[in-house]
């Protein structure tokens, strides 16, 4: 007799609050059983085992005294994955090896869940996370993008800056931190100043993405779920004078409002997501 497949696995981390909790509550109301897996707690606080043999394969994990058999999992929400939280006194050579082995073990565990419905599959997410691929696909389907330069050449960056009369912002291609609040070394989207490019030798160690600065009226955050849009909007005039990135504002009154996307824009974003299979 097989266990009932009524569990929805929520893949996240211990610093994730509110959103994942709301999703868990909604799942419970609809009769499903949410199982939260904080990936950063593996391997120190999460136990996992995979048994492979001629008689069959078994995969299970235990987290916060809750036991999960993969046969119980009906669907997976891949929200966030964090690296393991390991002891600070662990020798660097062992630390890197432990992280690598732990991440690889979790990758194998995800494979055991391939029969479940994923939102979204890790392979598709990894393909879609490439910013240059995002920009190329956006162009192909008719979305407007800002003029963009990715380089580790200081002279190219200076020429780009001058060509746009200083209206340039800079960001990384990948996040240094995966939390909304970032960390002590988090880098926000920032406006480029001329003095930043006087001595840009450090660019040779780390290529960055430079983009034309577009004056903002609203900042939109769009959640897309199977053709449905859930859009939050910020009034950019509340923070544009003090910061380029809304996450840096000190305005405690900054609030999100519901927003309706223009039909043509919604259609193109829908096509954009289909291109990535999301």
Segments from the language model and where they lie:
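General beta-strand structural signal in soluble alpha/beta enzymes
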Residues: 36-37, 118-120, 147-151, 170, ...
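Rossmann-like NAD(P)H-binding beta-loop-alpha module
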Residues: 141-165
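Phosphate-binding site of ATP-dependent enzymes
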Residues: 27, 157-158, 163-267, 272
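Conserved N-proximal alpha/beta basic substrate-recognition cap immediately N-terminal to
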Residues: 3, 14-30, 35-144
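Extreme N-terminal starter segment of soluble prokaryotic enzymes
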Residues: 4-9
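Short, basic, helix/turn surface patches
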Residues: 59-70, 149-150, 169-182
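Short acidic/polar capping segments at secondary-structure boundaries
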Residues: 83, 123-126, 150-156, 174-176, ...
């Amino acid at each position: 007799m097989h266990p009932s497949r009524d569990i929805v696995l929520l893949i996240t981390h211990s610093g994730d609050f509110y959103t994942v909790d709301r999703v868990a509550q909604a799942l419970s109301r609809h009769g499903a059983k949410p199982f939260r897996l904080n990936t950063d707690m593996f391997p120190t606080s999460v136990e996992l085992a995979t048994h492979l043999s001629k008689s069959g394969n078994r995969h299970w994990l235990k987290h916060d005294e809750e036991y999960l058999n993969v046969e119980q999992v009906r669907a997976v929400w891949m929200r966030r994955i964090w690296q393991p939280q390991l002891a600070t006194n662990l020798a660097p050579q062992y630390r890197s090896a432990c992280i690598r082995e732990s991440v690889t073990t979790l990758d194998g565990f995800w494979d055991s869940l391939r029969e479940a419905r994923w939102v979204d599959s890790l392979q598709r997410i990894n393909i879609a996370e490439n910013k240059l691929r995002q920009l190329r696909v956006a162009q192909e389907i008719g979305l407007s993008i800002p003029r963009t330069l990715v380089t580790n050449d200081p002279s190219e960056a200076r020429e780009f800056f001058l060509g746009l009369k200083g209206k340039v912002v800079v960001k990384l291609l990948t996040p240094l931190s995966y939390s909304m609040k970032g960390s002590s070394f988090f880098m926000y989207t920032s406006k480029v100043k001329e003095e930043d490019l006087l001595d840009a030798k450090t660019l040779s160690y780390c290529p960055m993405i430079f983009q034309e600065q577009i004056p903002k009226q609203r900042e939109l955050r769009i959640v897309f779920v199977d053709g449905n849009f859930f859009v939050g909007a910020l009034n950019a005039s509340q923070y544009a004078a003090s910061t380029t990135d809304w996450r840096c504002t000190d305005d405690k009154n900054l609030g999100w409002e519901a927003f309706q996307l223009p039909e043509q824009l919604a259609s193109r974003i829908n096509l954009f997501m289909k291109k990535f299979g999301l």
